[in-house]
Amino acid sequence: MSSRDSSIKAPVHPAAKAELKGRRILVVEDSPVVGPFTADLLGELGCEVVGPAPNMAAARELVEAGDFDAALVDIHIRGERVFPLCEMLEAQGVPFVFTSGYADRNMPEKWEDRPRVQKPYTLDQIEKALRGLFEEDPKS
């Protein structure tokens, strides 16, 4: 995934880039390939990356520290489900998008309607998901 081709690198609409520019996005991702790939995509959108957090302990520390506008959260981090972390994000009013490479049929009802991006994702999918978060929650 680290060497992207034109099918993955979609052009970024200038207005969308401006809307996301400077937004601090927490990345919770345990894959040593997907984490940096996601950070690269966010950089192309003008976002500042917090993380990537490769495990739950690092993710909890970053969430407790705050200082980000939204999060991209992999549903499974080293075999752990991330829902306790999501509770922390929700308590802080931080909007987030789930990412997953699995069909995850056992999603708790509370989180079923949460925005989600299926791996492997593209720049366009990440852009759309983040813009959706900020349109839903303009204060963030």
Which residues fall in each region the model found?
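The feature encodes the CheY-like receiver
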Residues: 78
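Active-site residues of response regulator receiver
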Residues: 74
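Conserved acidic carboxylate
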Residues: 29
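Two-component/phosphorelay signaling modules centered on CheY-like receiver
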Residues: 32-51
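A Lys-centered signature of the CheY-like receiver
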Residues: 119
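Non-catalytic signal-transmission and effector/linker regions of two-component phosphorelay proteins
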Residues: 1-24, 108, 122-140
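Acidic, metal-coordinating helix/loop segments flanking the phosphotransfer/catalytic sites
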Residues: 52-70
